[in-house]
């Protein structure tokens, strides 16, 4: 669900409305990169029985370095929480006319209720709720394409990598931040560790025997899980951009979620616009646990401090409500929150590639040379993109 949060919606919708099909290639590339990265994260948790923050916490010996690393990881997790609350507030405003600040508070209360379901009723009850929300999200964001299909020539042309000024680079960074999501890298390694954890604490060397299932079999199943999840998420994210490119390009005011909603309502009817708003609301609620879970795991792994998920959620509501209360444009805040995520990706990705390449840590399951090369290329590309973005911003380009 991390790949279908309001940050994805804002980034893809704005990119399609402003640049048409220009950044289709970024969505596709981001999805391919996310597949590799999330599989490596899951593999690390399965093979070692530890999360990425745990492994880094044991390997970063200087306390100030460990705290600095924790701070940047905590900021990207908090940026995700901010996006969820703002997206839910905008959706409630579009659907029911609720003021943004009150909508943010309502979204926060509902997200806390969902976390209670997860903690008290177990993962299965929470997964049932999330699957239902996923169906709503997919329907809400793909319905418009049936009423106004995209231009096939434009879609194919959008697969050619290129930019058009600083704003397109900013949106590309936002799309990649929303797609790859560094906090999801931390969280997925922990989720895979917990999902396949044996009943009793076990040393890494004895995990396979304690589980009673071969590690290669678990890794094959994980590859399928990641493939299916990202195929669904990638399709929906691409649908959002194509919907905007086909219907909103050149229309005044459609570089905001509110403007996009109004244009969809005027051009395709109230049903499509309502489905869009419902999908936006569902995306904020469905991804509510990811940022809180990732932040808790980051703090425990790096600082060895445990904070209850609900307490974390209450704390992270503050910056989101402050943004809404100050009247900052919510779409701009959403897009910039995803840019923050893009700057956090290398800090999660580079250690992930290094650790999953080590024979002493993963043994026979370490990365193949081609996999490591792909991870290095992804890291270099993301660092270069962020460097170009900074240069354009500070040079006035």
Regions found by a protein language model. Give the residues of each.
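Extracellular loop-to-transmembrane helix junctions
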Residues: 14-39, 53-58, 102-103
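Loop-to-transmembrane helix boundary motifs in multi-pass membrane proteins
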Residues: 63-66, 101-104, 228, 271-273, ...
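Membrane-interface loop-to-helix entry segments
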Residues: 106-107, 118-144, 163, 340-341, ...
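Extracellular/periplasmic helix-exit of transmembrane alpha-helices
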Residues: 35-47, 192-207, 211, 231-259
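Helix-loop-helix module between adjacent transmembrane segments
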Residues: 33-42, 64-84, 92-118, 177-178, ...
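Hydrophobic alpha-helical segments and their helix-loop junctions in multi-pass secondary transporters
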Residues: 134-160, 169-190, 352-360, 385-396
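Transmembrane alpha-helical segments of multi-pass small-molecule transport proteins
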Residues: 68-74, 95-117, 135-140, 306-322, ...
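Flexible loop linkers connecting adjacent transmembrane helices
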Residues: 11-16, 39-65, 117-122, 251-265, ...
């Amino acid at each position: 669900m991390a790949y279908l949060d309001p940050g994805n919606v804002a980034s893809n919708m704005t990119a399609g409305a402003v640049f048409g099909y220009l950044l289709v290639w970024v969505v596709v590339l981001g999805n391919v990169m996310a597949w590799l990265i999330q599989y490596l994260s899951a593999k690390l948790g399965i093979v070692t029985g530890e999360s990425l923050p745990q492994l880094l916490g044991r390997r970063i010996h200087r306390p100030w370095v460990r705290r600095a690393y924790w701070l940047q990881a905590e900021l990207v997790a908090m940026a995700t929480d901010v996006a969820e609350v703002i997206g839910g507030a905008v959706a409630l405003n579009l659907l029911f006319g609720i003021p943004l600040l009150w909508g943010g508070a309502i979204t926060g209360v509902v997200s806390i209720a969902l976390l209670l379901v997860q903690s008290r009723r177990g993962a299965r009850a929470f997964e049932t709720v999330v699957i239902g929300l996923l169906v709503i999200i997919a329907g809400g964001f793909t319905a418009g394409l049936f009423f106004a299909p995209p231009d096939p020539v434009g879609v194919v042309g959008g697969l050619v990598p290129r930019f058009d000024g600083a704003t397109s680079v900013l949106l590309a960074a936002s799309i990649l931040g929303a797609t790859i999501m560094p906090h999801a890298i931390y969280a997925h390694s922990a989720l895979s560790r917990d999902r396949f954890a044996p009943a009793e604490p076990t040393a890494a060397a004895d995990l396979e025997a304690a589980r009673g299932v071969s590690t290669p079999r678990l890794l094959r199943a994980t590859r399928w899980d990641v493939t299916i999840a990202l195929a669904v998420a990638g399709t929906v994210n691409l649908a959002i951009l194509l919907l905007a490119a086909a219907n909103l390009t050149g229309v005044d005011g459609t570089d905001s979620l509110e403007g996009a909603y109004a244009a969809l309502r005027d051009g395709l009817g109230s049903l499509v616009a309502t489905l869009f708003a419902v999908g936006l609301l569902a995306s904020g609620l469905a991804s509510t646990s990811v940022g809180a879970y990732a932040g808790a795991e980051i703090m425990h792994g790096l600082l060895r401090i445990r904070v209850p998920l609900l307490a974390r959620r209450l704390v992270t509501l503050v910056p989101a409500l402050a943004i809404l209360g100050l009247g900052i444009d919510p779409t701009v805040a959403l897009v910039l929150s995803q840019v923050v995520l893009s700057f956090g990706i290398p800090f999660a990705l580079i250690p992930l590639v290094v650790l999953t390449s080590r024979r002493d840590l993963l043994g026979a399951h370490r990365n193949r040379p081609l996999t490591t090369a792909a991870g290095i290329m992804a890291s270099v590309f993301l660092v270069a993109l962020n460097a170009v973005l900074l240069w354009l911003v500070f040079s006035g380009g």
